From Swiss-Prot:
Purpose: Phosphorolytic 3'-5' exoribonuclease that plays an important role in tRNA 3'-end maturation. Removes nucleotide residues following the 3'-CCA terminus of tRNAs; can also add nucleotides to the ends of RNA molecules by using nucleoside diphosphates as substrates, but this may not be physiologically important. Probably plays a role in initiation of 16S rRNA degradation (leading to ribosome degradation) during starvation.
Name of this chain's protein: Ribonuclease PH
InterPro entries: ExoRNase_PH_dom1, ExoRNase_PH_dom2, ExoRNase_PH_dom2_sf, PNPase/RNase_PH_dom_sf, Ribosomal_Su5_D2-typ_SF, RNase_PH, RNase_PH_bac-type, RNase_PH_CS
Protein keywords: Nucleotidyltransferase, RNA-binding, rRNA processing, Transferase, tRNA processing, tRNA-binding
Keyword Zinc-finger recorded: no
Organism lineage: Bacteria, Pseudomonadati, Pseudomonadota, Alphaproteobacteria, Caulobacterales
Residues involved in phosphate binding: 86, 124-126
């Protein structure tokens, strides 16, 4: 039995609220149960120096946790003067995941930055950030298309992510913090709308896990991500 009493293949309650920031070209507040992540998309009419004069744009991401996103207050990384390795790893993952479904040439020489701020953390913040960031990015590119800034849609498809793990010997979908901190194995899957793999992170925490268990986790991830794709489409109006 899972602590939340969910079935092994059941996502937490997922919510996607759009238009939560009046200034950003795209914004989304995504919830996976008690995990809440605010994502804003900012369009800038320039690209990093190493991308100049290449006729293509760039999509990048930043990730951070608000001080009281967890049970105890965490110091702001800005106050500490540097980002942790975890933060850098996660924001690179978010950027890679989004670029997998973007035609950078169609974007033109402009950059879209997805700022992912964890308001409340209860496991799965990186996967929630990726799933919500796609919604904010899609809204930002739709804005650019509607305004006539872009002539060709740069979005090639959807991307979403979910965690899976082995908890009490059973493969389960979408781990919350209690499950994640006690899992025998955990993983994160990032898949596109056509089923391509962008990234898989899988780790044996308390023991190694078998190929059969991995395939079970993969199957759970596909099921959960397909449900997330439907929620993404509903959030952007189809």
């Amino acid at each position: 039995m899972r602590p939340s009493e969910r079935a092994p293949d059941q996502l937490r309650a997922v919510t996607l609220e759009t238009g939560v920031n009046r200034y950003a070209e795209g914004s989304c507040l995504i919830g996976f149960g008690h995990t809440k992540v605010l994502v804003t998309a900012t369009v800038e009419e320039n690209v990093p120096g190493w991308m100049r004069n290449k006729g293509a744009g760039w999509v990048t991401a930043e990730y951070g946790m608000l001080p009281r996103a967890t049970h105890t207050r965490g110091r702001r990384e800005a106050a500490a003067g540097k980002q942790t390795g975890r933060t850098q790893e996660i924001q690179r993952l978010i950027g890679r995941s989004l670029r997998a479904v973007v035609d950078l040439k169609a974007l033109g020489e402009r950059q879209i930055t997805l700022d992912c701020d964890v308001v409340q953390a209860d496991g799965g913040t990186r996967t929630a950030a990726i799933t919500g960031a796609w919604v904010a990015l899609r809204l930002a590119t739709k804005y650019l298309l509607d305004e006539g800034v872009l002539k060709t849609d740069p979005i090639l498809g959807q991307v979403a992510a979910v965690s899976c793990g082995v908890f009490n010997g059973v493969p389960v979908l979408d781990l919350d913090y209690e499950e994640d901190s006690n899992a025998e194995a955990d993983s994160n899957f990032v898949l596109t709308g056509v089923g391509d793999i962008v990234e898989i992170q899988a780790t044996g925490e308390k023991r190694g896990f078998t190929r059969a268990e991995f395939e079970s986790l993969y199957g759970l991830a596909e099921k959960g991500i397909n449900e997330l794709f439907a929620l993404q489409r509903a959030a952007i109006g189809g």
